[in-house]
Protein backbone atom coordinates (compact mmCIF):
# COMPACT_ATOMS: atom_id res chain seq x y z
CA UNK A 1 0.00 0.00 0.00
CA UNK A 2 1.32 3.41 -0.96
CA UNK A 3 0.94 6.33 1.37
CA UNK A 4 2.21 9.88 1.33
CA UNK A 5 3.03 12.36 4.03
CA UNK A 6 4.47 15.83 4.25
CA UNK A 7 8.06 16.33 5.28
CA UNK A 8 9.31 19.73 6.40
CA UNK A 9 12.98 20.42 6.98
CA UNK A 10 14.67 23.78 7.41
CA UNK A 11 11.85 25.69 5.75
CA UNK A 12 11.39 23.22 2.92
CA UNK A 13 8.25 21.11 2.74
CA UNK A 14 7.77 18.30 0.29
CA UNK A 15 5.68 15.20 -0.21
CA UNK A 16 7.20 11.85 0.52
CA UNK A 17 5.57 8.69 -0.75
CA UNK A 18 6.44 5.18 0.26
From Swiss-Prot:
SS bond partners: 4-17, 8-13
Biological-process GO terms, alphabetical: defense response to bacterium
Tissue: Hemocytes.
Subcellular location, principal: secreted
Keyword Disulfide bond: yes
Record's subcellular location: Secreted
Keywords carried by this UniProt record: Amidation, Antibiotic, Antimicrobial, Disulfide bond, Secreted
GO cellular component: extracellular region
Function of the protein: Significantly inhibits the growth of Gram-negative and Gram-positive bacteria.
The family this protein is said to belong to: Belongs to the tachyplesin/polyphemusin family.
Protein name listed in UniProt: Polyphemusin-2
Amino acid sequence: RRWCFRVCYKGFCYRKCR
